[in-house]
Design a protein with these regions (language model features):
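Catalytic-core regions of core metabolic enzymes
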Residues: 1-382
Length: 385
């Protein structure tokens, strides 16, 4: 992948920083934070490919470009060892039983490619982003009309029949199903369930915008109903950031019917009000680990554990950890920076930290007034990135 190529270029002696990718807003933000931005780079579109380098001199730059060429050729050589169908049509000719397509193409092509798959009665996991809200709604309405899954756009994690897709991990099969509108949250949740000795049937992603008012939870409801109908799924976890009000009522009503008559449902609206699911008689979770513990207990027919509201560690062990870590710091250090590989993990950590520390500044803050553009260089206090 392009991330791996960026990592390899950084290993070239004399390369201070390297970034290879498409011109998405996220990648351009990374370029700004890492000091690689330029007027030329800021002018590109999400469909443009770019290479940004910070090298000590021209000789290092030449070596880095040579390494880039080698990495790109290496990728092509590895592909030549196996057959990779160039189109969906040719893939279906090679294997007519295909019923799921994982799509990762530039955003301007994503709608057409996903629509083509749905036309052919193939479920879709759309990894691509930069798809308009209007196109997303059209795709999902079409998928629902054909009783197909349209996971995404910007769906980064799913596990289907034990097969991890995109950023998912290999985990054990088990009795728990996940309906998730958060990729990193779903990924972390599956790992926690696995570590607790259980496993999952399916982890179905929807894309982060599905529960917004404009989309109306079209795919969340589709995935939820699929898990309700699945006889191997004994417990369901609903995971998302707080949905739009009317969408929350609709999906919670479906969950209540399931919880009352079919199978238990655990709800984790990250950063939301845990009392809302309780009003529907559902099991509310306060964080990802709390959701995992409660789902595993319910799957075993055990009592639901007490709410996990704080760090679950013996006091003496926690104090020893604090002493060990603070001993590594200089006396002048007083603010910390939290670095997270996913927005959900940052949100959850901020929610837990704000209650004890007050303001947490971030590039994705829980409160608008705590917004900072460049948390790597800001000197205004505690920050999560």
């Amino acid at each position: 992948t392009l991330m791996i190529i960026s990592k390899e270029l950084k290993k070239v002696p004399g390369v201070k920083e390297a970034l290879v990718g498409m011109g998405t807003d996220l990648n351009l933000d990374i370029a700004k934070v890492t000091g690689l931005s330029s007027p030329e780079l800021e002018a590109i579109t999400p469909n443009d490919f770019f290479v940004a380098l910070d090298c000590e001199n021209e000789e290092v730059e030449a070596a880095a470009l040579k390494a880039l060429e080698e990495q790109l050729n290496k990728k092509e050589e590895s592909r030549s060892a196996a057959y990779y169908p160039p189109t969906l049509t040719s893939a279906l000719k090679a294997d007519p039983k295909i019923n799921l397509a994982l799509i990762s193409v530039p955003g301007r092509h994503a709608y057409d490619v996903a629509k083509d798959a749905l036309d052919k009665n193939i479920n879709v996991m759309l990894f691509s982003d930069n798809v308009s809200m209007e196109e997303e709604k059209k795709l999902k309405e079409y998928a629902v009309s054909k009783e197909l899954l349209m996971m995404g756009p910007d769906c980064g994690t799913a596990v289907v029949n034990g097969l991890p897709l995109a950023f998912a991990n290999v985990i054990h099969k088990g009795p728990i199903g996940i309906c998730g509108a958060s990729g990193t949250g779903t990924q972390e949740l599956t790992i926690l369930i696995d570590q607790l000795g259980s496993g999952i049937t399916q982890a179905l992603g929807t894309g982060g915008r599905d529960l917004k008012a404009e989309i109306g939870g079209l795919m969340f409801k589709q995935c939820l109903n699929a898990l309700i109908a699945d006889p191997d799924t004994k417990v369901i976890i609903m995971l998302s950031k707080p949905p739009a009000d009317h969408v929350a009522k609709e999906i919670l009503a479906i969950a209540k019917e399931c919880n009352d008559h079919i199978k238990p449902v655990v709800v984790d609206f990250i950063g939301g009000d845990p009392n809302l699911p309780k009003e529907y008689g559902l099991t509310a979770a306060y964080n990802l680990e709390d959701a995992a513990r409660k789902a595993v207990a319910l799957s075993k027919g055990e009592p639901v554990p007490a709410d996990m509201l704080d760090i679950d560690m013996p006091k003496a062990e926690l104090e020893a950890l604090i002493e060990r870590e603070t001993s590594k710091m200089a006396p002048t250090q007083k603010y910390y920076r939290g670095f997270f590989s996913g927005g959900t993990l940052a949100d959850e950590s901020m929610k837990l930290s704000i209650g004890k520390l007050g303001h947490i500044y971030s590039n994705i803050p829980l409160k608008p007034e705590d917004k900072i553009e460049n948390p790597l260089t800001a000197e205004i206090g505690r920050a999560h990135v």
